[in-house]
Regions:
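Transmembrane alpha-helix boundary and packing residues in multipass membrane permease domains
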Residues: 34, 38, 50, 87, ...
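Short alpha-helical transmembrane segments in multi-pass integral membrane proteins
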Residues: 1-31, 89-154, 187, 198-254, ...
Length: 456
């Protein structure tokens, strides 16, 4: 039985055949819906920010936007596990082990529920201490705490969506998660407008709308898994934690999650420094950050594409195909990100004004866009090379190098360069500086590992 027969044809199972045929078209068909999903999700999140900023004021905008690093800090470890799920299932598909794939799917969904409940409890309990630790201004603290506690009620839904979407990605399906986000996002925007503008619920209305939308997206992804491709079909009654799969998922996913957590810690430190400039700076930074997310999600989509294509082809021992997938993802990811960043920066005042009418907040947003957004494409050097290593099972290496290059250097910057020149512009320069360092480290490690793997 040849590899194609082992892994079942794409036509028969309605899954993408990543092991055979031209790569570029398949990579774009995989990555672009994935990028669209993330960008669409961010558009809906941005709607939260825009509605609050326009109809509730700068304090409410600061309360919602200032929470972003905190939320990322608490969920990144567990979202990292979904990366492990993608790699493990992808490897089993590449090896043609159908029963292992099915076991992994039910293990993944059980882990999603457990992680979600854990986050709900931790996020609710630690909301106030964390917000106080990052110097959240007194006038913003009550609103920020209210938003965070309501937001974390939806964590089980967030985890189910992310883990379920990872399962679908492992078979090349990036379209149905997009459909789930379209539906949930429209619901989110409608609820935002009603709860904030009509019922005057301020940040609580935005948080409630987000929780309901998260519930919808999780329900849809679960439905897709229960009725879709037989190989990854999900039956809630069969949910269990298989030791072998749990260990493999944690081995791949935990370093990625740990990287995300430490990354978020450094961003929380930067957010604390931003908070020191006052409410206007927090609001302006939050506005600019939304555009960084739009561009970063393109890079992240090609990162996940690299992980998935590499995991399947590495499992099938097609190393040259792994190399080609990496090159295509790197070039296309950085090119698209660069074009998007340039457009946002060219019309920076207009885009900043979408989220706030406050002139001082817009000034801060413009500074961040010029110093950070314009160079966002540099993140591709470490994200995509790190994705290639994870696809081959080397998850710890990119995690450690990113911690050293990005996180360690950012904290060092805050206590050295920023101390000497404590301006908002100098604070923002920490981002591109760390991207250059981390990109050199992770790319170098990838080339070394690739050479060693090829020599085996």
């Amino acid at each position: 039985m040849n590899i194609k027969e082992k892994n079942m044809s794409a036509q028969k199972n309605k899954q993408m055949d990543m092991l055979n045929g031209p790569l570029l078209k398949k990579i774009l068909f995989f990555a672009l819906p994935l990028a669209a999903s993330s960008i669409l999700q961010q558009l809906f999140n941005s709607a939260d920010v825009a509605v609050v900023g326009r109809f509730a004021g700068s304090k409410s905008l600061a309360a919602v936007g200032g929470n972003t690093p905190v939320i990322s800090l608490l969920i990144n470890l567990f979202v990292g596990l979904s990366v492990g799920a993608n790699v493990v299932i992808g490897n089993y598909i590449g090896q043609g082990k159908k029963e292992k794939v099915k076991e992994s799917v039910h293990t993944v969904m059980a882990m999603a529920v457990i992680c979600g409940v854990f986050l709900l409890i931790i996020g609710t309990v630690l909301a106030r201490p964390i917000l106080m630790a990052i110097n959240t201004p007194d006038e913003v603290l009550p609103l920020a705490m209210l938003y965070l506690r309501i937001y974390f009620v939806g964590m089980p839904f967030v985890m189910v969506y992310n883990f379920g979407a990872a399962v679908l990605r492992s078979i090349g399906d990036t379209k149905r998660p997009l459909y789930a986000l379209i539906v949930s996002g429209i619901i989110n925007i409608c609820l935002n407008l009603v709860l904030v503008i009509v019922f005057k619920l301020d940040v609580a209305g935005v948080a409630i709308a987000t929780v309901i939308a998260d519930c919808v997206s999780a329900s849809l992804v679960t439905y897709f898994l229960m009725t879709g491709d037989e190989m990854v079909r999900f039956n809630p009654k069969k949910m269990s934690l298989k030791k072998e799969q749990v260990i493999k998922i944690i081995k791949i996913g935990a370093p990625a999650g740990l990287q995300g957590v430490v990354f978020s810690v450094s961003n929380v430190c930067i957010q604390s420094a931003i908070n020191g400039f006052g409410t206007k700076a927090i609001a302006g930074s939050s506005a600019a950050l939304n555009y960084e997310y739009f561009t970063y999600y393109v890079i992240n989509a090609f990162n996940q594409t690299t992980v998935t294509f590499t995991s399947q082809n590495y499992g099938a021992k097609k190393l040259e195909r792994c190399k080609k997938a990496f090159r295509l993802c790197l070039v296309w990811g950085m090119a698209i990100t660069g074009i998007m960043s340039l457009i946002f920066v060219l019309f920076k005042e207009f885009f900043a004004g979408v989220y706030t009418a406050d002139s001082q907040a817009i000034d801060y947003a413009v500074i961040r866009m010029v110093h950070v957004l314009l160079l966002e494409l540099l993140t591709g050097t470490y994200e995509i090379s790190g994705g290639a290593m994870r696809g081959m099972g080397y998850s710890l290496v990119p995690a450690l190098l990113t911690v050293v290059g990005c996180c360690g250097f950012r904290v060092a910057w805050l206590y050295t360069v920023f101390k000497i020149c404590p301006t908002f512009s100098m604070l923002m320069n920490v981002y591109p500086a760390t991207w250059v360092i981390t990109g050199a480290l992770v790319m170098g490690a990838y080339l070394i590992i690739r050479r060693r793997v090829s020599d085996k």
